[in-house]
Amino acid sequence: ATPCYAWALIPNHFHLLIRTGLVPVATVMRRLLTGHAIRFNHRHQRSGHLFQNRYKSILCQEDPYFLELVRYIHLNPIRAGLVADLHSLDRYAYSGHSRVMGKLKGDFQDIKTVLSMFGETRREARKRYNAFVFKGFLAGKRPELTGGGLIRSSGGWHAIKEFRRMGAHFKSDERLLG
């Protein structure tokens, strides 16, 4: 099994936070995207590709970036203008936030792991998780979260600038989270 900790469906893309396991990410994504395309095409009596480009992935070490990714992914529907606020997000069917908050059910998402990082009981954990997400909502875009996996895994912008000063060059995907 491939645990999913956070997800959000947006009209033109989606986000998943999954743990790699015995099955490579490429295989998981191929199965997911192909299966979805087949079902979608059948339901809408159409054929062809649904997605324009290959998926993008970044490597995430669990501490501390894991929780930042959970928050970023679950706030995506607000940033995309699909819901107005956190109260609406609590019941938004196309994001894992509603499952973590216990407002909607779904057995494919591992909410226990996420909640365990916020408290001993589900009630306490949900309260602290919601406060954490709200804090991210209030913060808006955060410059310290700029950059793809390379920047975070290399020790941040300071380390990257030092590497560049020494003449090192990297290929990376720059992204803004926040």
How would you label these PLM feature ranges?
Residues 1-11, 19-178:
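Short Pro-Cys-Gly-centered "Cys-loop" motif that presents a nucleophilic cysteine in a tight turn
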